[in-house]
UniProtKB/Swiss-Prot annotation:
<dbReference type="GO" id="GO:0005654">
    <property type="term" value="C:nucleoplasm"/>
</dbReference>
<dbReference type="GO" id="GO:0005730">
    <property type="term" value="C:nucleolus"/>
</dbReference>
<dbReference type="GO" id="GO:0016604">
    <property type="term" value="C:nuclear body"/>
</dbReference>
<keyword id="KW-0694">RNA-binding</keyword>
<dbReference type="GO" id="GO:1990251">
    <property type="term" value="C:nuclear exosome focus"/>
</dbReference>
<feature type="compositionally biased region" description="Basic residues">
    <location>
        <begin position="140"/>
        <end position="160"/>
    </location>
</feature>
<dbReference type="GO" id="GO:0071920">
    <property type="term" value="C:cleavage body"/>
</dbReference>
<keyword id="KW-0539">Nucleus</keyword>
<feature type="region of interest" description="Disordered">
    <location>
        <begin position="129"/>
        <end position="166"/>
    </location>
</feature>
<dbReference type="InterPro" id="IPR012677">
    <property type="entry name" value="Nucleotide-bd_a/b_plait_sf"/>
</dbReference>
<dbReference type="GO" id="GO:0106222">
    <property type="term" value="F:lncRNA binding"/>
</dbReference>
<dbReference type="GO" id="GO:0033620">
    <property type="term" value="C:Mei2 nuclear dot complex"/>
</dbReference>
<dbReference type="InterPro" id="IPR035979">
    <property type="entry name" value="RBD_domain_sf"/>
</dbReference>
<dbReference type="GO" id="GO:0140517">
    <property type="term" value="F:protein-RNA adaptor activity"/>
</dbReference>
<dbReference type="GO" id="GO:0005737">
    <property type="term" value="C:cytoplasm"/>
</dbReference>
<dbReference type="Pfam" id="PF00076">
    <property type="entry name" value="RRM_1"/>
</dbReference>
<dbReference type="GO" id="GO:0005634">
    <property type="term" value="C:nucleus"/>
</dbReference>
């Protein structure tokens, strides 16, 4: 093979590599655009969720036999109720004993908070503003493993000899 042929093949390989790099850069730009669009959508969803949470209340100590209709009629004096959600155990299907009530506007939440302590099915309801769930907060970031281990080193030490005042 002559030097000219070697140069031609190297130039061909170089051109092919440049084409592949250009394709990869175009694909990377497309991926960046898609990621930016996704970020914007999740931000909009997060803002939407926070606005819904601002017009909702948590109702605790709810009797297991209470229906969503009963809760809606109980809170009807506060204003227009959009949604009543009684949470159930996903394995048994039984109610967990609390609910969320979403109102048509955030200004109705203080009226609902006045019903804190009101009786429904002979149980005092606990009514508080709904907190916005922050992902990862309940896990505590890694604490809680190996609880009850910090007892020093070594195994059985036997009965201590000597004076034990207590």
């Amino acid at each position: 093979m002559s030097d000219q042929d070697a140069l031609d093949t190297q130039e061909k390989e170089l051109l092919e590599m440049k084409e592949r790099v250009a394709e990869m850069e175009a694909e990377a730009a497309k991926l960046r655009a898609m990621q930016e669009q996704l970020d914007n959508e999740t931000e909009a969803l997060r803002n939407d969720k926070e606005s819904i949470d601002a017009q909702s209340v948590y109702v605790g100590n709810v009797d297991y036999s209470v229906t969503p209709e009963e809760l809606q009629s109980h809170f009807a004096s506060c204003g227009s109720v959009n949604r009543v959600t009684i949470l159930c155990d996903k394995f048994t299907g039984h109610p967990k004993g609390f609910a969320y009530i979403e109102f048509s506007e955030p200004s109705l939440v203080p009226n609902a908070l006045l019903l804190n302590g009101s009786m429904l099915h002979e149980r005092p309801l606990k009514v508080t503003p709904k907190r916005t769930n922050v992902p990862g907060m309940s896990r505590g970031r890694g604490r809680g493993r190996g609880r009850g281990r910090g007892r020093g080193r070594g195994g059985y030490r036997g009965r201590a000899r000597g004076f034990a005042p207590y």
